[in-house]
A protein has these predicted regions:
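Gram-negative bacterial Sec-dependent N-terminal signal peptides
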Residues: 1-21
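Intrinsically disordered, low-complexity peptide-like regions
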Residues: 15, 26-28, 191
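Short, low-complexity N-terminal intrinsically disordered segments enriched in polar/charged residues
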Residues: 21-88, 92
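Short beta-strand edge/turn micro-motifs at domain boundaries
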Residues: 31-33, 151-159, 169-201
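Short beta-strand segments enriched in hydrophobic/aromatic residues
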Residues: 63, 162-164, 194
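A solvent-exposed, acidic/Ser-Thr-rich amphipathic alpha-helical stretch
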Residues: 70-146
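Acidic, glycine-rich flexible loop segments
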Residues: 128-176
Length: 202
């Protein structure tokens, strides 16, 4: 059963009086919940569920493309492609990005800069010596299973599972949350990316 987000009480938690006058709404698709938060409508066009799903697919396609580029042409070529992906999909040109990768720890857990994100995906940076390149692990396909998408004007958040299959047929599942904003050119930019391995009690 899809989970429906109950956001009716959210307005009381927000300081701006204008929000209290606009109720939140909820809806659902066949497999996951969609929430549209009430609030002051931004000047930019509201982000839609279709745009969020397209952005998710673009991310998955890019990860597979970087892995393929690495296998075909080596690390330098993969790094160039990864840089292009960061420049088009992420919001580092807007400021820090709240990026917590799956396989990161210690002082380099959070990758708020483009440099840190690039190192995580393709390695090869002495400032991030533990990074071996998450995007270089032979990924061949992916599947996305959303638990919820939250829409709020020109911002959106999703959470769910991403299943990644490598060239050995092994599947890695990661719990993933993304947050997007619409930039001045109308494109969606990732400004939040949190990824972790599923918790195991054993």
């Amino acid at each position: 059963m899809p989970k429906i987000l109950a956001l009716a009480g959210l307005a009381s938690l927000l300081a701006a009086p204008a929000y209290a006058q606009l109720p939140a709404t909820t809806a659902h698709t066949d497999t996951y919940a969609v929430a549209t938060l009430g609030g002051v409508a931004p000047a930019a066009a509201p982000i839609t569920v279709a745009e969020v799903e397209a952005a998710q697919r673009a991310w998955g396609n890019a990860l597979v493309a970087i892995s393929t580029e690495y296998k075909t042409n080596g690390q330098a070529a993969a790094a160039r492609l990864a840089g292009q992906v960061l420049d088009t999909a992420y919001g580092y040109s807007l400021g820090p990005v709240a990026f917590k990768p799956t396989l990161a720890s210690g002082e380099t857990t959070f990758r708020t800069t483009r440099e840190g994100a690039l190192a995580y995906f393709v390695g090869g940076d002495a400032n991030f010596p533990s990074d071996t390149g998450f995007a270089l692990k032979g990924w061949q396909s992916y599947a996305i299973d959303n638990a919820a998408i939250v829409l709020n004007g020109s911002t959106a958040i999703s959470t769910g599972n991403v299943m990644l299959t490598n060239d050995k047929g092994e599947v890695t599942t990661v719990n993933k949350s993304w947050g997007w904003v619409r930039d001045a050119n109308g494109a969606l930019r990732i400004v939040l990316h949190h990824s972790s391995l599923p918790y195991s009690a054993h």
